Amino acid sequence: LMIPKLLDAYKLILKLPQGHWKEVKLEEIKGLIADCAGLYLEAVADQQNAVKNGEVKVTIEAINRSNSDIELGSVNSMFISFPTSLKPYELKKNKKIIIESVAGTFNYQNYSSPYWLNKKGTIGMYHVDDKNNIGLPEKMMSFPIVFQLTINGTYLSYNRNLVYKFNDPVKGEVYQPFDVLPIATASIQEKVIIFSDNNAKQIPVTVRAGKDNLNGSVKLESPNGWLISPESQMFSITKNGDDATLIFSVTPPKNQSEGKLIPVLTVGNQSHQKELFTIDYDYIPLQQVLLNAEAKIVHISIEKKGENIGYIKGAGDAIPESLEQIGYRVTSINPSEITSKNLNQFDAIVVGIRAYNTVPELAFKQPELNSYVENGGTLLVQYNTSHRLVTNEFAPYQLTLSRDRVTDEFSEVTLLAPDHQVLNYPNRITRADFENWVQERGLYFPNKWGKEFTPILGMSDKGSKQTKGSLLVAPYGKGYYIYTGISFFREL
């Protein structure tokens, strides 16, 4: 009984002058009509991804759960060309209509990616072209399919987003967004590659296919003075989703230099320079993110002392990979391996970020670490939060963490102990090394420490008191204990 009255209201709203609220109320009342009719409309792609100007098969499903006279007149889209021979279908009560394997040509001109990442933003601000998307967790309908219906003689259209779905043995029916991706993407695993001498490095480039039987070439663009060999390489990938890895030799110039290393793919007469990241968690829709494919390459003169470094993993950082790039041998140390005998093989030991928050065994291993330092080792502990430490005895002397931090990555850094060897050996550290910081100076700096510690750096946010606990060094026995809350891990 409600549907005829709602249709009458819909017709009356249609007669109103054009305006924002007219459009809002038309959509709302169309939704009420669909709800009262128990109307189910769905468009499902047979694959999760497609490429520009490719083919995609769509299955249309429609159900009318009411006594209303409903006819599906047509289905169309701005991006998919459905066959013009699609005939009208009468939607009888509780009789499912399935139009299977409707082939179409994909005309979508953009790639799928979170709208706030499509263009480079500024510090603290994303660049969004379509202001209607701002604040939305996802872009509004990416691939709307328009269902043209006649309900009790009244013409209505409904938009449904094209989706991909499959049956999971555990989760059941799983829905995922349907995406348009490049025909090929590329990636360089190491995002920062450091050349500490003039020797060449072998750089692997991984090419991922976005379609079956993909053939093309890849080359590396680099700053002036860098040598790439070979100049380009061919690739051939049989199956969509598979990848191929090609190795390039990259030689730095003799002088110090830095810039971007960019893999450029050529397929047919088109070039592609994107890298694909997939974010897949149960609590959010699957996200396929396209970013510029690139790595930073740096040729810098670095003096290196020692050879073997031990690394105790915390919450995760790229410290080991970065140290390996400049020639160190880095060995991961499991908590059970923290013994005097095992530790003595290392010239230095680095403790990963938040290890004293996340590794319970460290509550019992600190005496072994202190003994290592006492016998001549160097122990560098990165930041931990002041809350829920597994032990408060994480240093050989008094050391108390606070919530002090410096969030402005451009804040001035003062060298409190410019002659200290930590700033001069084996490489000289100056204020210039703190320029072009990526994000914040550091956090959870100690605010109380024993007289044995020397504060090395001072820093503060504008209008705040200078903090001096960002980098503390103390001799202990024959070695050194270093604690730092500086966000080195964000710079790597």
Feature map (PLM): residue ranges:
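Extracellular ligand-binding/catalytic regions of CAZymes and related secreted enzymes
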Residues: 19-24, 155, 175-218, 284-292, ...
